[in-house]
Regions:
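Non-catalytic, mobile gating and regulatory segments of ester bond hydrolases
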Residues: 1-149, 153-308
Length: 308
């Protein structure tokens, strides 16, 4: 991971979990908390920072995930954090570096699938399955509600993990809240059908013209799961616009057209206040569909920006 995905300790907001309610269904307060957990999941190389931030949020660290992955995709490791409150177990997965997003999009569009779940994401979930399962089982025994979350490719790893826990005969997971931010299409119809127990409590947030949720293209037969909440470039997300049932948006062709129009009409303003030099100017140089994908953009659209 590059410094794009890491945030100075003093920029992690102490109010990230102020609106978190483990007993609620979808709320923007829970979405904010989950997106901040996704941001922290990018920091697995900095154990002291993770400890300090979890303490700031009054969370208990259960595990830090960092495991090598052998995959057809450009994925070196599965990274994540497992933490808990007295009422919730939270499993958060990191995604990919913003500078690699264009390479990932190209990877997604090449080749034909051989299974009903994207092999790269399934391999990433398998790499940490035993440790994640142990944490989830412990949370269930302690009567804590399960939250699974991920940004970017981490959202896809979250879906693959949730499906593995559903299919685990001993665990037999049937209740969890799954939040993804800018996640790609992950499952084909057979796997989507098996994901049914969590379909209505899976929430996919998509910011602006983020290109990642539109891939792989539909001719490869991958689709989304859960209920989508979309917002315009710059936000805000509106809880009232969450549909009551599944929808497979955004469409590949529509997002691609938007991206092409942005390139033709000129550079896109950052939808958030930039971080200090050099990160701010470097983020501004990314393509529009990638700018809308970065954690800074999602946190801003959720009302808890990194740079307040």
């Amino acid at each position: 991971m590059s410094f794009f995905t890491e945030v100075d300790t003093d920029l992690y907001r102490p109010d990230a979990f102020s609106g978190f309610d483990a007993q609620a269904k979808f709320t923007l307060g829970n979405a904010r908390a989950m997106m901040w957990m996704c941001q922290l999941a990018y920091e697995t190389a900095h154990g002291d920072k993770i400890d300090a931030i979890l303490n700031r949020w009054q969370l208990t660290k259960i595990d830090v995930l960092e495991r090598a992955v052998t995959s057809s995709l450009r994925m070196g490791q599965t990274r994540g954090i497992i933490a808990a409150t007295d009422k919730a177990t939270i499993v958060a997965f990191a995604g990919t570096d913003p500078v690699s997003v264009q390479d990932w999009v190209a990877d997604f569009t090449l080749g034909r699938p051989t299974g009903d779940i994207h092999a790269g994401f399934d391999a990433a979930a398998a790499a940490v399955q035993d440790r994640v399962r142990q944490a989830i089982a412990g949370g269930i025994a302690a009567r804590r509600k399960l939250f699974i979350t991920g940004h970017s490719l981490g959202g896809a790893i979250g879906f693959a993990t949730a499906l593995r826990m559903i299919e685990d005969r001993a665990l037999n997971l049937r209740e969890a809240e799954v939040y993804s931010f800018g996640a790609p299409r992950t499952l084909r119809p057979g796997a989507t059908a098996r994901y049914a127990p969590l379909m209505n409590t899976t929430y996919r947030l998509v910011h602006g013209n983020d290109v990642v949720p539109s891939v792989p293209p539909p001719d490869l037969d991958f689709g989304h799961v859960g209920r989508p909440l979309l917002c315009p470039h710059g936000g805000p997300f509106d809880e009232a616009k969450l549909p009551q049932s599944f929808d497979d948006v955004p469409r590949f062709e529509r997002q691609l057209l938007r991206g092409l129009l942005q390139f033709v009409t000129g550079p896109l303003d950052l939808p958030f206040r930039p971080r200090p030099f050099p990160i701010g100017p470097l983020l501004a140089a990314l393509p529009p569909g990638v700018i809308d994908h970065v954690p800074d953009a999602y946190l801003h659209a959720l009302g808890t920006p990194i740079m307040a």
